[in-house]
Amino acid sequence: MRFSGKQILVTGAASGLGLAIAQAAQTEGAAVTALDRVAAPFDNSRICDITDEDQVRSVLSGLDRLDAVVNSAGIARRAKLGDTELADFEAVMAVNLRGSFLVSKHALPLLRQRGGSILNLSSGVATTGLRNRAAYTASKGAILSLTRNMALDYASDRVRVNCLCPGFVNTPLLSSLPPERRARLTALHPLGRLGEPEDIAHMALFLMSDQASWITGQAIAVDGGFNIGHADDV
């Protein structure tokens, strides 16, 4: 198993992509530390508000080694910029950006001891935009820049930093869409289907593994070809 004996920390591990990545890592032999605001289904599950530095510091200080970090926790608010309340904008930035910053900052001393990997979750819409998601797309665009800068800063410490840019994945949010909207969205994907959480987890594990030892500072789209053009005729 690729991660036998490895210690991996995953944020947002109670649901969605974080849960899928944490489960896949555990299946491959990793000892997973799962962080979320609610309990996650793992032996070492810690309730932690990643926007609170004291809580993050407390969790990380209790670990004696770490091989990889997955910054998967994220939230969104539906609104155009002019309709976005400051509190909502700050809440999205706090979880999506500040949380990734704080977890990475306090994980780095452990990762630098023997080398390791940080994997951030951005989004396919970070570079294209998405109507009514001003705060979300801004936060995910910032994750792209943060990833590249971290990769430059810590390459000499043998800490690789990459990010995934998932497309439209079957999560509870998409599952709630009316069937006709799901059908229209699916038709925009050259590969003819929406993503599954496992699609993202497979790439996440590759990027954290020794097989990706010469990959850093990269943003990898996992989106069924959505970002290369739409499959329907015009």
Whereabouts are the PLM-identified features?
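Residue(s) in the substrate-gating loop at a strand-loop-helix junction
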Residues: 123
